């Protein structure tokens, strides 16, 4: 059980005790009234029965009735005063406890009505006073006793007036405390509403901060991912640059080899022309010698030496031709490799352009601004002299 429930139960218990005391005071008043009525009836019976000592008996009965009325009135006043005193204090304590804790409920209107009715019931009845006065005036035979009774009645009136005044003040105090309780309760409810609103706003703010933190974490992850992609792109870009440099170097070497092949081909053509001229001159000399007739041994020996030298030159030319063919084959393979490098380079550039955030322009200029040699044709037909073997070929 929480503190709030315990305090509420204690307040209810105190209220029940106050009601119980009110009922006890009321029962005491009713008992006193019954005694007064019973004694009044006894007095009337005695008055109706005349005896030798009527005056004395009437005085004694009157004194007894007055004394009993005074005692009962004082007892009722004391009990009522105690109950009235205890009731406001207890109610005040209940209200204070309820206001201080801001948790107790205000007393119901029915309880207040019951308390007021009990307070009214606790008062000495006016009819009893009138009956007492009537009995005193009708039965008293002595003016002194009558004056005493009047003084006692006046005292009772004064006590009742004081008690009524005190009860009125206590009721006003209860009303003031009830109003203060209602005001404080309204303020407490308003404070609880504001506190609830603040709690809701704090919860919403915490939820927003958690979502913002999650969003920041996602952004950081994306940034790390983008940084990784950027690093990957930089690596690829560097790799492309290195490959481009290698391709340029390879292209440069191919151009140098092509230049050397062109020079070798030109030298070969010049030597071939020289060989043809020498062949023609040798054929011409052979015809002149055959037309003259017999030749001397020296001329025959010279011709043989000439033929041997020509055959040696033809073999040398054939060897150079073979070397040239091999060079052409290597050149063709190099051109195929160069074309494959160009294709691979274009694929890498296309992959780079497809990456998100890449530039739309090409990073490197196209180095393939020269014509690829698709066909090399070399005609080396050597059939212009005896013993020569023609070996035509084409690339």
Curated annotation (Swiss-Prot):
UniProt biased composition (Polar residues) = 42-71, 81-96, 291-300
What GO CC annotations are associated with the protein? cytoplasm; cytosol
Q: What is its main location?
A: cytoplasm
Here the segments flagged for biased composition (Basic and acidic residues) are: 103-133, 144-155, 276-290
The organism's superkingdom is given as: Eukaryota
Q: Which residues form a coiled coil?
A: 224-351
Region annotated Disordered, chain positions: 17-155, 276-304
* Name of the protein: Uncharacterized protein C713.09
Q: Where in the cell is it found?
A: Cytoplasm
Keywords for this protein? Coiled coil, Cytoplasm
Question: Where does the record place Low complexity bias?
Answer: 134-143
């Amino acid at each position: 059980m929480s503190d709030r429930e315990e305090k509420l139960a204690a307040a209810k218990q105190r209220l029940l005790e106050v009601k119980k005391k009110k009922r006890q005071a009321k029962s005491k008043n009713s008992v006193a009234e019954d005694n007064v009525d019973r004694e009044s009836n006894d007095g009337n019976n005695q008055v109706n029965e005349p005896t030798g000592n009527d005056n004395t008996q009437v005085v004694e009965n009157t004194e007894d009735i007055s004394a009993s009325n005074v005692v009962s009135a004082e007892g009722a006043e004391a009990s009522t005063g105690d109950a009235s005193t205890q009731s406001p204090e207890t109610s005040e304590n209940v209200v204070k406890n309820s206001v201080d804790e801001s948790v107790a409920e205000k007393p119901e209107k029915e309880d207040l009505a019951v308390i007021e009715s009990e307070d009214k019931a606790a008062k000495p009845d006016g009819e009893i006073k009138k009956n007492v006065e009537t009995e005193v005036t009708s039965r008293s035979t002595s003016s002194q006793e009558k004056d005493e009774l009047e003084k006692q009645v006046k005292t009772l009136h004064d006590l009742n007036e004081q008690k009524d005044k005190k009860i009125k003040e206590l009721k006003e105090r209860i009303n003031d405390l009830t109003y203060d309780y209602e005001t404080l309760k309204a303020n407490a409810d308003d404070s609880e509403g504001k506190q609830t609103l603040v709690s809701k706003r704090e919860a919403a703010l915490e939820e927003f901060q958690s979502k913002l933190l999650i969003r920041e974490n996602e952004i950081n992850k994306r940034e790390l991912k983008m940084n990784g992609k950027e690093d990957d792109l930089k690596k690829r870009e560097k790799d492309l640059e290195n490959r481009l440099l290698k391709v340029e170097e390879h292209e440069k070497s191919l151009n140098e080899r092509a230049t050397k092949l062109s020079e070798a081909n030109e030298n070969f053509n010049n030597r071939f022309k020289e060989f043809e001229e020498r062949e023609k001159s040798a054929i011409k000399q052979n015809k002149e010698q055959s037309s003259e007739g017999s030749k001397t041994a020296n001329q025959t020996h010279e011709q043989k030496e000439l033929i041997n030298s020509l055959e040696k030159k033809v073999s040398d030319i054939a060897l150079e031709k073979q070397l040239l063919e091999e060079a052409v084959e290597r050149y063709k393979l190099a051109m195929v490799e160069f074309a494959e490098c160009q294709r691979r380079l274009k694929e890498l550039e296309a992959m780079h352009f497809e990456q998100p955030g890449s530039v739309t322009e090409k990073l490197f200029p196209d180095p393939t601004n020269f014509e690829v040699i698709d066909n090399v044709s070399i005609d080396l037909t050597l059939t212009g002299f005896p013993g020569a073997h023609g070996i035509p070929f084409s690339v």
